[in-house]
């Protein structure tokens, strides 16, 4: 009788999840020993780069009892954000910035958190006196291994979660519960011998199947990294100004992707002309990207990325705008502008940089100027 009651409760919770717009529902145990070991090894290899929050939350990621005492079950949820077909054709338009598909929409954290809170009410109503904790990739939780255990998909060689029915274009979220619930069947891995994601990566960030060196990943370089983008990766970034979808674009399983019915995830902005973006002031940036995930990297982060993309654009029309941007108040932006001018103008940029050198005080900008000067002096 108790089992029948529990089954009915789970059915009601699952139905509510789908009613709220989630596309996948599964339940698993909080025990992830192997994934925890792999995570610690990944950290020890330095693959987290400057994402120090990863190491700070290591203990909690490996033991979810430190997140919710006496946690017994994890309800894993999937939310499709696929809005439009995407191909590698964006590389044919170097004057336009490429944005990760998920970031063309409103910030998913706000949308999904609201839905999770609604589902949380249903859980607490069905499972009386239970304690819960919700997450939308913002806390110390190994959500992809958990989602794999919960049957929502398998972790692919690119380290994204894949499913046979909708590919990988979706967000994950979780609700921790201190009640023992029947577990879903774990998903099987269907990557086989495919290497498409590994071979397409512009920076060779997938150092081996299922292992990503974040320090090389363009998503890390354009979003997580707060400082200067290492010179050796700038050409490979191309016109990608927020994230990178290459490994997902070429994945065969994404041919099964189904467009989301979520109105909030319909693309709200797709015009990212680099010359327009490099001219954005602080107020214009805030207005344009209000409610967008892009606001996370702030104006200085976005224009840093735009400067790199302009350097890769082979567009001489960008030069006057880059020269003007040498006066930007943000040293991080100015530093990458210097590199971009070197790429577009060659040695002709030296007089401009020499003039700027006399008034520049910031070390990161001075280093870039000296690097460009050295490069062309050696070649002269």
Language-model features, listed with the residues they occupy:
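Auxiliary alpha/beta "docking" domains used to position bulky ligands
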Residues: 1-190, 359-363
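Short, charged low-complexity linear segments at domain edges
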Residues: 161-186, 214-233, 281-283
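Immediate flanking context of iron-sulfur cluster ligation sites
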Residues: 183-192, 234-242
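Structural detector for internal amphipathic alpha-helices that build alpha-solenoid repeat scaffolds
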Residues: 303-313, 334-346, 366-379
């Amino acid at each position: 009788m108790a089992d029948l009651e529990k089954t009915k409760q789970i059915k009601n919770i699952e139905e509510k999840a789908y009613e709220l717009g989630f596309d996948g529902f599964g339940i698993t145990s909080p025990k992830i020993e192997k994934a925890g070991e792999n995570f610690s090894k990944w950290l020890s290899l330095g693959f987290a780069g400057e994402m120090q929050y990863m190491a700070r939350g290591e203990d909690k990621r490996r033991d979810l009892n430190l997140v919710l005492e006496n946690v017994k079950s994890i309800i894993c949820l999937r939310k499709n954000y696929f809005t439009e077909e995407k191909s590698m054709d964006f590389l044919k338009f170097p004057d336009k910035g490429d944005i990760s598909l998920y970031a063309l929409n409103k910030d998913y954290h706000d949308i999904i958190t609201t839905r999770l809170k609604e589902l949380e009410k249903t859980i607490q109503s069905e499972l009386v006196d239970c304690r819960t904790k919700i997450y939308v990739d913002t806390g110390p939780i190994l959500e992809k291994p958990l989602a794999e255990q919960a049957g929502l998909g398998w972790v692919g060689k690119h380290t994204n979660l894949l499913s046979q029915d909708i590919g990988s274009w979706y967000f994950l979220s979780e609700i921790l519960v201190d009640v023992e619930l029947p577990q879903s069947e774990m998903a099987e891995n269907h990557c086989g011998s495919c290497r498409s994601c590994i071979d397409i990566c512009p920076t060779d960030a997938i150092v081996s199947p299922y292992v990503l060196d974040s320090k090389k990943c363009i998503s890390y370089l354009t979003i997580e990294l707060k400082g200067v983008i290492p010179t050796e990766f700038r050409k490979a970034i191309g016109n990608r100004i927020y994230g990178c979808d290459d490994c997902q674009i070429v994945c065969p399983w994404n041919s099964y992707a189904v467009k989301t019915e979520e109105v909030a995830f319909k693309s709200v902005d797709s015009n990212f002309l680099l010359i327009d973006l490099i001219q954005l002031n602080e107020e214009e940036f805030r207005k344009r990207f209000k409610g967008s995930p892009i606001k996370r990297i702030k104006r200085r982060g976005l224009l840093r990325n735009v400067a790199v993309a302009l350097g890769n654009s082979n567009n001489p029309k960008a030069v006057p705008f880059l020269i003007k941007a040498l006066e930007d108040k943000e040293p991080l932006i100015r530093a990458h502008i210097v590199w971009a001018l070197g790429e577009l103008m060659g040695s002709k940029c030296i007089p401009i940089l020499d003039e700027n050198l006399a008034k520049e005080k910031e070390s990161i900008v001075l280093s870039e100027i000296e690097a460009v000067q050295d490069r062309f002096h050696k070649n002269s």
